[in-house]
Every structure is written in structure tokens, then in C-alpha cells.
């Protein structure tokens, strides 16, 4: 993937990650304090933003496939632990989200709480990942001008 494509994917992923995080928090809150209709609206918004996050997340991983290959060869360094944690959390949150969608006929399972807790952890790891790589994103932006 060329620099312009990587930059577009990274910015899009950042935007949908924020949307996914916010809709997830509002969805959780709506489950405690609002009507089913309000909860349902937040659920739809969260699912749409999550599907977009999955799409742009997959493109982001594809663009940085070299990092995963070097990880398997034991040649990563520095900021790798945050990226590894982020990757694992992304998989866990995605899996618990899919399980919850498959279990819509079973209300009040513990999976929802796990999804929420791991989602918050994913948000923290994402912020750390973005902060550690912010300068790289800015360099990429200036390189495509």
C-alpha cells in the first residue's frame, strides 16, 4: 500500500475507532438508564461503527504486515508490546462482539460485560498506540503533499 493509502486508512481508522468507543460507552449507559428504543439506536450505531472499524483495522494490519512478520521472527523492538497488546485486545473484542450478536436471543449474558471491559482496555491501548506513533503519522502526511 502506498503512503497516501496508508495515511487515508490510518485517519479513517482513527475516526471510526473514536466513534466505536463513544457509541460503546453510550450503549452501555443506555442499557442502565434509557428505554429499549434508545438502547437499540445506540446498538445500531455501535454495530455500524464497529464494522467500519473492523474493515479499516484489517486494512491497517495489511498495510503494516511487515511488522507482524518481524514479530514472528523475533525482530521487533521498542513500541512492540503496545502494538501486540492492541492486536490481542482487538481480536478479543471482535470475538466477544460476534458472540454477542450470535446470542441476541440470550439476554444478560456475561459476554456483554467482558466485551465492555476489554473494549475499554482496547481504547486505552489504542490511545497509547496513537500517541507513540503520532509523529510517524505527521511525517506520512507531509510526505504525500
Where are the predicted features?
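Membrane-embedded alpha-helical bundles that constitute the cytochrome b-like, heme-associated redox core
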Residues: 1-145
Amino acid at each position: 500500500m502506498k503512503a497516501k493509502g496508508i495515511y487515508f486508512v490510518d485517519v479513517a481508522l482513527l475516526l471510526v475507532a473514536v466513534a466505536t468507543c463513544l457509541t460503546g460507552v453510550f450503549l452501555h449507559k443506555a442499557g442502565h438508564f434509557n428505554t429499549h428504543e434508545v438502547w437499540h439506536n445506540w446498538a445500531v450505531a455501535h454495530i455500524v461503527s464497529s464494522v467500519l472499524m473492523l474493515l479499516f483495522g484489517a486494512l491497517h494490519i495489511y498495510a503494516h504486515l511487515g511488522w507482524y512478520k518481524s514479530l514472528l521472527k523475533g525482530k521487533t523492538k521498542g513500541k512492540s508490546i503496545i502494538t501486540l497488546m492492541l492486536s490481542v485486545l482487538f481480536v478479543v473484542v471482535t470475538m466477544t462482539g460476534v458472540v454477542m450478536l450470535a446470542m441476541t436471543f440470550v439476554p444478560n449474558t456475561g459476554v456483554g460485560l467482558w466485551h465492555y471491559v476489554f473494549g475499554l482496555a482496547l481504547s486505552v491501548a489504542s490511545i497509547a498506540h496513537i500517541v507513540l506513533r503520532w509523529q510517524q503519522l505527521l511525517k506520512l502526511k507531509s510526505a504525500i503533499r
